[in-house]
């Protein structure tokens, strides 16, 4: 059985694949539809995913400045660089993840001014689930704009072992 830290690393490999698919989905929107408010909403939703990942890394002490939680007006061309920088920082953090870090409690100041305390495991679980939620929204927006929505469910990424030959 793999450790919980190993599972978080594996799940982040999956999330990185989903990030690439999300960028491809956004790029698939026809040029004539990119001026639509829904397109900017989809791009900004992806920027929010990046910002959320950075915000949690900041709260954990591994990102210098807290990002704006809901970026507006992000350019599609800016997303690949934002994603790459964020992924590199998360890979570096997760490479050092162990049971002691997962159990560590940390405190942070929320945007509403309240302070919270949580264990790292809970924060990583929230961050992972948060991405699933918004990727579904991005896929719906892309499909509505005439782009190619991609199913980013985990089952399509993991390596299943077929037991029977296809009929």
Set out the residue ranges of the language-model regions.
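Mid-chain, well-packed structural core segment of small domains
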Residues: 102-109, 118
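Extreme N-terminus of proteins, especially the signal/transit-peptide cleavage junction
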Residues: 1-6
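Short, contiguous alpha-helical
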Residues: 9-71, 111-167
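Helix-adjacent hinge/juxtasegments
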Residues: 62-104
